[in-house]
């Protein structure tokens, strides 16, 4: 007997995507958006199948992601943002709540939610992860969600 193995393909054709983007640290966040859009387009998504929702900060990402997921207008959500450590515990609180909140949205709605939120120690690390030395985490998040949409379609 052979074990059946199911995987999601990397075709975005026909899928509808919501990008939920934090405006805080937007000069880096916009690079994540560009990376995500590049990935979606390269894998067959049409611009008409993508909606970008912008919210004030990373703390608001889960709320907007949940609204997008529950709208019935999207097959997946890509959450993008940039949280850079400062000199207070604020970073730890925001990073933890955004992470937990986005995971909860995926579990509650059964809509794939990709985590493209940078949590870095400094500005240099954030810039590296938005398209210079360490690739573009927006692109990576879009790739993840494309695969998850196609995996979900096989259940």
From Swiss-Prot:
Disulfide bonds: none annotated. GO terms for biological process: riboflavin biosynthetic process. It holds the Pfam family DMRL_synthase. One of its GO terms (cellular component) is riboflavin synthase complex. The keyword Transferase applies. It catalyses: (2S)-2-hydroxy-3-oxobutyl phosphate + 5-amino-6-(D-ribitylamino)uracil = 6,7-dimethyl-8-(1-D-ribityl)lumazine + phosphate + 2 H2O + H(+). The keyword Transferase applies. It is an enzyme of class 2 (transferase). Keywords: Riboflavin biosynthesis, Transferase. (2S)-2-hydroxy-3-oxobutyl phosphate binds at residues 87-88, 129. Its EC number is 2.5.1.78. This is 6,7-dimethyl-8-ribityllumazine synthase. It comes from Chlorobium phaeobacteroides (strain DSM 266 / SMG 266 / 2430). The lineage of its organism: Bacteria, Pseudomonadati, Chlorobiota, Chlorobiia, Chlorobiales. The gene is ribH.
């Amino acid at each position: 007997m052979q074990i059946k193995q199911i995987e999601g393909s990397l075709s975005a054709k026909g899928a509808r995507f919501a990008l939920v983007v934090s405006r805080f640290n937007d000069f880096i966040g916009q690079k994540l958006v560009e990376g995500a859009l590049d990935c979606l387009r390269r894998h067959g998504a049409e611009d008409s199948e993508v909606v970008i929702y912008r919210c004030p900060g990373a703390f608001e990402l889960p709320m907007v992601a949940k609204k997008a997921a529950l709208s019935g207008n999207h097959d997946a959500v890509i959450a993008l943002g940039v949280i850079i450590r400062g000199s207070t515990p604020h970073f730890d609180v925001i990073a933890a709540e955004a992470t937990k909140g986005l995971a909860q949205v995926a579990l509650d709605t059964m809509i794939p939610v990709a985590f493209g939120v940078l949590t870095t120690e400094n500005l240099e690390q954030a810039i590296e992860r938005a398209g210079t030395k360490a690739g573009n985490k927006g692109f990576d998040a879009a790739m993840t969600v494309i695969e998850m949409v196609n995996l979900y379609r096989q259940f």
